[in-house]
Amino acid sequence: MNKKTRKIVFVGLYIALAVVLQYVSGLIPFLQMPNGGNIDLGVIPVLMASYQFGYKTGIFTGLLCWLINLVLGISGSWFVSIPQYLFDYILPVSLLGLASAFPKIGKINNIYTGVTGAMILKYLSHVLSGVYYWFPETTY
């Protein structure tokens, strides 16, 4: 099999796996938080794609996962404003693809630093989304 064909097939498999895991994690009650949010299993295939093919393909895989979840209605998106939607839904999934871009620190393998760094970036993106949603009310 050609390298490009192999890459396309694997990215398709990672996207399909991410969509299925996102759907399944929405069905499992103990993964749902009482005040909103959940533990998302769909991030695992995006991280795997990033480490197998590099951060550019990881970002692309994350964006396609978001798009397919949006089309299928799995993600349960909540639109308030464009910056809020960008920072809460599009950017976090894309930032997961950056996991392979984090370097090795000392004796710590770059998988640990990459996954931790990508999850911190994802968290910061959600925090910025909250700022865009809650901050305008307190400015008056």
Predicted regions and their residues:
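Loop-helix junctions at membrane interfaces
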Residues: 1-140
